[in-house]
């Protein structure tokens, strides 16, 4: 590999894939990233231990062959806890109420999400009934699933006429706190709080009718803003669909 290519390769590696190791106050080296990835595969396929070790020694560490870079980034506990992290991209038409919760779950897992708000999809959504007069406290857990559940509970309250959730953010770690499982730093509760407020505002304005494509698009954008605030990848939107079918 030429020097210019090596420099570019190292920049991408240490910026996107190397975990910070608090005990020694530095990021992983390329060889350590490969060892973490190989160890995950060996735990999954112990009968192939020696073959995996040899492949990484002869091909992966010298960068002759590269595995899925998503698996290199999240190798270990993140993928073993939720294998959705190994996916690079996904697609989700907004044709059912829980699509919004699925989108935030995928985005927080590092998966790119393309979505469609074409009228033929959005027409499948139910009429927004609005929540009942009864409130209930919902404690948001400090996890990807916790954030996704908060969105799901809010949408369900408005589409199924359930009790109005009063969100409790006390368990979400403060901004800047270390994320142990996946690495990086926590965004704090504010991005999610803002997102839920924006979603609630749109839902309130559409009680008694179905959401329109532009409203669904706005909701997806508010969700992706919350995820971006945490330094995770964003949603994408197909340029050919910029003119929304908001009939």
Mark where each language-model region is.
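Extended catalytic cores of very large enzyme megasubunits
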Residues: 1-247
